[in-house]
């Protein structure tokens, strides 16, 4: 049986995550009281007619604070029943969360006459801290639209052909911010930039003219070889430490040329030696 626990601050995309999982065959339960997590796991194992072998639940800040504080203990009880449990934590910048609530005119569950929306968001962050600390996978939805979030969840949680650590090699542009869910970040902004070549500007690192240009630059080759050597040596150690997810982020200025080229090459090489390697270009 597989159990996915979805959590995160309000407005970060939990409902979308549950919709994706339900569309993928999961039996979904919204706003499960955290204290019922071990009981749910036990019932799912005993009564397979009632529940599917794939279950997803959301746990949010409407739970009793005492139950949220006990989340590490409750999760351990569920895992002790030999259930594959993945904790997905969604989040976004506070400014973006404020904007989303303003646009949708929804009420935050923790606001009241004495607590503003901004204060409610900060309180919620503290309440969900025990869950965030144990997340197997964190997804920052700050720069993701609805469709990108759906694709990201499918890529990271559902498209794993084999068990083991799931690796994501992701390109990004620093001008749109670093991905906060990255485990390893490599900055390639020091490399020659195709953007300043008028004939290359409108192309991306996926296009042959840019590939040919960057492949001919000695510094690009040196940078690629150094990053590749580091990852080939150390990523197996991450896998051996039972990490469920590892994200490697490669950043350049705009996320269109250098980072895309390096990410594509790294992804292709890592796929030859590691299982479950995915490639994503955040800003293309």
Curated annotation (Swiss-Prot):
Q: Which residues does the annotation say bind GTP?
A: 60-63
InterPro entries in alphabetical order: P-loop_NTPase (IPR027417), RapZ-like (IPR005337), RapZ-like_N (IPR053930), RapZ_C (IPR053931)
Q: What is this protein called?
A: Nucleotide-binding protein Pput_0988
**Molecular-function GO terms, alphabetical:** ATP binding; GTP binding
Q: Which family does it belong to?
A: Belongs to the RapZ-like family.
Its annotated function is as follows:
Displays ATPase and GTPase activities.
Give the Gene3D superfamilies listed for this entry: P-loop containing nucleotide triphosphate hydrolases (3.40.50.300)
Q: Which HAMAP family match?
A: RapZ_like
Q: Which residues bind ATP?
A: 8-15
Entry keywords, A to Z = ATP-binding, GTP-binding, Nucleotide-binding
Which species expresses this protein natively? Pseudomonas putida (strain ATCC 700007 / DSM 6899 / JCM 31910 / BCRC 17059 / LMG 24140 / F1)
């Amino acid at each position: 049986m597989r159990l996915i626990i979805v959590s995160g601050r309000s407005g970060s995309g939990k409902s979308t995550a549950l919709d994706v999982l339900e569309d993928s065959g999961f039996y979904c339960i919204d706003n499960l009281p955290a204290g019922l997590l071990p009981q749910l796991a036990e019932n799912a194992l005993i009564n397979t007619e009632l529940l599917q072998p794939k279950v997803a639940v959301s746990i949010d800040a409407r739970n009793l604070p005492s139950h949220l504080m006990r989340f590490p203990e409750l999760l351990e009880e569920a895992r002790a029943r030999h259930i594959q449990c993945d904790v997905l934590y969604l989040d976004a910048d506070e400014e973006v969360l404020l904007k989303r609530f303003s646009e949708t005119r929804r009420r935050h569950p923790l606001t009241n006459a004495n607590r503003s929306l901004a204060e409610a968001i900060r309180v919620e962050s503290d309440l969900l801290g025990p869950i965030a600390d144990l997340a197997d996978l964190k997804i920052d939805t700050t720069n993701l639209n609805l469709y990108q979030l759906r694709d990201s969840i499918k890529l990271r949680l559902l498209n794993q052909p084999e068990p083991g650590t799931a690796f994501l090699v992701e390109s990004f542009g620093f001008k749109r911010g670093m991905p906060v869910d990255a485990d390893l970040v490599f900055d390639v902004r020091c490399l020659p930039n195709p953007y300043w070549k008028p004939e290359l500007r409108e192309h991306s690192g996926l296009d042959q003219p840019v590939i040919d240009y960057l492949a001919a630059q000695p510094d690009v080759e040196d940078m690629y070889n150094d990053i590749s050597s580091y990852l080939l040596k150390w990523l197996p150690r991450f896998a051996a430490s039972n990490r469920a997810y590892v994200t490697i982020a490669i950043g350049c200025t705009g996320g269109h040329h250098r980072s895309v080229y390096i990410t594509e090459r790294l992804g292709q090489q890592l796929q030859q030696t590691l299982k479950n390697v995915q490639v994503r270009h955040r800003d293309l």
